[in-house]
């Protein structure tokens, strides 16, 4: 699997029923209005026969599902045309820890090494009434039917392609029921469905799994892009949040990246789109279970990004959700990397944002809540970081709305200067 793995939560009616009462309470206050998207990064993807690493002391659930495989570039596809963009389907397993909340991105639950086995692609025309079976050690353990999904494959492809261009090889996991099968080290998990070759994986204590030296490569020059929310106390206060006690990490899809001196589109009929100047840390070598003291040894260097957000699309599900943060071209980033040796202290850099020459945002990386080495140690505790992976470390206070015609310049001291222009949807066509 060489593309981006998108997945959707709360897409089975049993999940919505189970969480119905909770979704009326804080922090949700209402059921989700749109599909609740998340990303399974490249470290999660394994093939049939490869071991699923079992993290010590955790409860782990097998989430048998089916993956839609994109066959050609898809942008703003109508539901009735979706079949033209589907190469086929594959059995998949959205392995997960139990969900305690859907408010913030579930990176610890969903993004661990080997937590996304995917089988062979089969050229089926429709999976809207497909029964998916799970066997554990050769015995039936569970089954469910895709007819009980809230949104079918065509609806999901249409909804995702409305804001994110999909490329050949990308996949969409269609969802899982609320009830899933608990797995243990020593189990063999088999996912079955008519018309598909079985997807079978052993479950192995993660201490016995040799770190994979290579992972499926994405069809773009970048690795996984991790981003931090509320990692400056003044920015958290600006948005009326308490500073987080644990890093608020979310993932950004490749479609959102663009370069220096490029344009970003402000969608029609929105009220607030803002910039975010950020220092980006680029990983230089594979990192797993790295200590904070050793973490800087795994840094290749630094670059700059502008992590735009469309606040109109915020919902209290996996906040900040993909519609806010992973729209096409919404993350300008410099293509150059400044070697870490040229930046003696990444925690003493000034960040600035100018809009049409006016200084709108200024801060310092000295105010990071979670430092660069802490973030590397934190992430590598439960997942493998690979060369080319990036961590956008968050933004200080000073947000303001930007509109078509604005020139937005973000600077990080010693790292670089990034220029971007805002255009309307009509201009972008």
Swiss-Prot record:
One of its GO terms (biological process) is 4-hydroxyphenylacetate catabolic process. Keywords: Aromatic hydrocarbons catabolism, Isomerase, Lyase, Metal-binding, Multifunctional enzyme, Repeat. Its cofactor is Mg(2+). SUPFAM superfamilies: FAH (SSF56529). Belongs to the FAH family. Its EC number is 5.3.3.10, 4.1.1.68. It catalyses: (2E,4Z)-5-hydroxypenta-2,4-diene-1,2,5-tricarboxylate = (3E,5R)-5-carboxy-2-oxohept-3-enedioate; (3E,5R)-5-carboxy-2-oxohept-3-enedioate + H(+) = (4Z)-2-oxohept-4-enedioate + CO2. It holds the Pfam family FAA_hydrolase. InterPro entries: Fumarylacetoacetase-like_C, Fumarylacetoacetase_C_sf, HPA_isomer/decarb_C, HPA_isomer/decarb_N. The lineage of its organism: Bacteria, Pseudomonadati, Pseudomonadota, Gammaproteobacteria, Enterobacterales. The keyword NAD does not apply. Gene3D superfamilies: Fumarylacetoacetase-like, C-terminal domain. A divalent metal cation binds at residues 276, 278, 307. Pathway: Aromatic compound metabolism; 4-hydroxyphenylacetate degradation; pyruvate and succinate semialdehyde from 4-hydroxyphenylacetate: step 4/7; Aromatic compound metabolism; 4-hydroxyphenylacetate degradation; pyruvate and succinate semialdehyde from 4-hydroxyphenylacetate: step 5/7. Approximate repeats lie at residues 1-215, 216-429. One of its GO terms (molecular function) is 5-carboxymethyl-2-hydroxymuconate delta-isomerase activity. Decarboxylates OPET (5-oxo-pent-3-ene-1,2,5-tricarboxylic acid) into HHDD (2-hydroxy-hept-2,4-diene-1,7-dioate) and isomerizes it to OHED (2-oxo-hept-3-ene-1,7-dioate). Monomer. This is 4-hydroxyphenylacetate degradation bifunctional isomerase/decarboxylase.
């Amino acid at each position: 699997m060489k593309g981006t793995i998108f997945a959707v939560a709360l897409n089975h009616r049993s999940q919505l029923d189970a969480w119905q009462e909770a979704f009326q309470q804080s922090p949700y206050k209402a059921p989700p209005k749109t599909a609740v998207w998340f990303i399974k990064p490249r470290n999660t993807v394994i093939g049939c026969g490869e071991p699923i690493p079992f993290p010590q002391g955790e409860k782990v659930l097998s989430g048998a599902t089916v993956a839609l495989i994109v066959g050609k570039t898809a942008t703003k596809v109508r539901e009735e045309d979706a079949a033209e963009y589907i190469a086929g389907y594959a059995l998949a397993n959205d392995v997960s820890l139990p969900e305690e909340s859907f408010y913030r991105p579930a990176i610890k639950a969903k993004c661990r090494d080997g937590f996304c086995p995917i089988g062979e692609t089969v050229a089926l025309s429709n999976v809207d009434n497909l029964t998916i079976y799970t066997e554990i050690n050769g015995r039936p353990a569970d089954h469910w039917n895709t007819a009980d999904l809230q949104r079918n494959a065509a609806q999901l492809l249409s909804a995702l392609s409305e804001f994110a261009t999909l490329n050949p090889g990308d996949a969409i996991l269609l969802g899982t029921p609320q009830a899933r099968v608990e797995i243990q080290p020593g189990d063999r998990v088999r996912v079955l469905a008519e018309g598909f070759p079985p997807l079978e994986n052993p479950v192995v204590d993660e201490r016995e799994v040799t770190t994979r030296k290579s992972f499926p490569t994405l069809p773009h020059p970048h690795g996984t892009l991790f981003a931090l929310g509320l990692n400056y106390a003044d920015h958290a206060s600006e948005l009326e949040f308490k500073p987080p006690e644990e890093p608020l990490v979310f993932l950004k899809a490749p479609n959102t990246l663009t370069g220096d001196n490029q344009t970003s589109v402000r969608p029609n009929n929105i009220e607030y789109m803002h910039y975010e100047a950020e220092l980006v840390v680029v990983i230089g070598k594979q990192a797993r279970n790295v200590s904070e003291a050793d973490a800087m040894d795994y840094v290749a260097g630094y670059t700059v990004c502008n992590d735009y957000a469309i606040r109109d699309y915020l919902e209290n599900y996996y906040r900040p959700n993909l519609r806010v943060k992973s729209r096409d071209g919404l993350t300008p980033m410099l293509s150059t990397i400044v070697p870490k040796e040229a930046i003696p202290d990444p925690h003493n850099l000034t960040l600035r944002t100018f809009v049409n020459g006016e200084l709108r945002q200024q801060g310092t990386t000295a105010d990071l809540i979670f430092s660069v080495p802490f973030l590397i140690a934190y992430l590598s505790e439960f997942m493998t970081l690979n060369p080319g992976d990036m961590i956008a470390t968050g933004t200080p206070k000073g947000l303001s709305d930007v509109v078509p015609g604005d020139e937005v310049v973000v600077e990080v001291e010693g790292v670089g200067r990034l220029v971007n222009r805002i255009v309307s949807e009509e201009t972008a066509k």
